[in-house]
Amino acid sequence: DEGIITAPITAVVRKGKERFVCDARLAERASLVQPSRKRQTNSLNIAAHILDMDHIPELSRYDRCRICVPQSCPRDCFMRLDCRYQQYLRDSMKPDIQICNHNYLLADASHRLEDRPLLLRSYQALVVDEAHKLPDAARQMYTETLSPHNMDELCLLLQQAHYKDFA
């Protein structure tokens, strides 16, 4: 009524790629399933229409692992031009509000530092689900730990480099 907001506000929930269906992997997996396995066949058929695996009923953990988007998509993928996941990535940059969890935010920060493609569009406001886990996740991601074995190796290297005071 006041004319402050002139268009609908849009939002998208961002998730890691392991939560989405890879159509190429789905086709391969579906071809291996026996038709007599009705529940499994049904879940895989639903996956052909629903990209987000969290919304596919009765999808087994095994099939979820077999049909999810891989860590890196092959450049020669036969589904590249029609890939639902790639389309989702393009479309998810458009909404006004990005919603993600702490791990996705840290992954985006890592991409920005390494000049890799952004996971989140440039934002002025961001909703972070599970934000209370952010400090621990960042600490775990950006902290190096040395085991006693690592320390022994380091001492040996220092000794070999004639730094006897440190060994």
Summary of predicted features, one role per range:
Residues 1-98, 102-103, 156, 163:
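A substrate-engagement module of RecA-like helicase motors
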Residues 78-97, 102-167:
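Signature of the SF2 helicase/ATPase Hel1-core->accessory helical subdomain module
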